[in-house]
Amino acid sequence: MRILVLNAGSSSIKLRLLDANDAVAFSRDLSTEGLKTPRALVEAVGESEFEAVGHRVVHGGTSFSGPAIITGQVQEKIASLEELAPLHQAASLEGITRARQAFPNLPHVACFDTAFHSDMPAAASTYAVPLQWRERFGVRRYGFHGLSHAYASRRSAEMIGRSLDSLRIVTCHLGAGASLAAVAGGRSVDTTMGLTPLEGLVMATRSGSIDPSVPLWMQSRAGLTRAEVQEALERDSGLAGLAGTADMREVLKRAANGDVGAALARDVYMHALRAGIARMTASMRGIEAVVYRWGGGALIRDSISGRRGPGVSRYPARRVP
């Protein structure tokens, strides 16, 4: 079965056609062109034939713990979660809408980033907030990048020749959005993102975890609206807020050339990353491997492994395709 995979993310739109053996028949990046019309998708696919369309969807809430055939009702449920992932859910919905219009006679399947984390232990998924918040409004740690974390853990186990069931792995998804997962025996037991993709590590334009009182204080002190605070934390913070650029490669380059702001951004990012890896390791009570998923992951790995403790070995870098 040939499947067209559409990944409409917060900063990119990518297409892949997979054959029956999961080999990539073709790959297209539509980040520049966008998906303003169904025709754009049809033209991108060209003469290629496929039997189904798979969609990456960031937030599945409590409704989806696995893939789901997309119906009108499912699409409405996905739309209802947009407030919890404003940078991502709208992009996913646009991709779903355009693809269903372009290929109305094919099955469309939503694969949720939150699904991999849906059975995390209660100690990891539960926030210490009022019971009503948790029961009535579903406030909990959902976690994200689940498709990436699941793949990275599975593929790395294959590469090092060990059974996934026997491994404790910290997977590091380091893109514009960044998160870690503690994967023990193939199961997510902890992760850094939470109710939304804003929690956790320092990211390209997102703040990551901060004192929850900061937004309230800024609303009171600076007179900012809720929307202005959210915009600042989602789009004007992270590396961009510290160094004036959201590109980690540029940050590292500037820092190496003596740029003070870039050096601070690098150090704050690395501090949060090291602390996150330590937390994930503690959640599993040990670790066998750390896996980085990012084009510049080797740069990050070298910085992290330079401070490894006793008994921790560094293996030669191997690319996870």
Each predicted region: which residue ranges?
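Conserved phosphate-binding/catalytic loops in two-lobed NTP-binding clefts
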Residues: 307-321
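Adenine-nucleotide phosphate-binding core of ATP-dependent small-molecule kinases
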Residues: 231, 235-284
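Short glycine-aspartate micro-motif
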Residues: 2-5, 52-54, 109, 169-173
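Glycine-rich phosphate-binding loop of actin/hexokinase-like ATP-binding domains
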Residues: 119-218
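Short glycine-rich, Thr/Ser-proximal phosphate-binding strand/loop in the N-terminal lobe
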Residues: 3-36, 194
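Phosphate/pyrophosphate-binding loops at sites that engage ATP/ADP/AMP, CoA/4′-phosphopantetheine
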Residues: 40-51, 158-163, 276-288
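Short beta-strand-loop/turn "lid" adjacent to the catalytic site in phosphate-handling enzymes
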Residues: 45-89, 106-109, 115-127
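Glycine-rich phosphate-binding loops at beta-strand->alpha-helix junctions
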Residues: 287-310
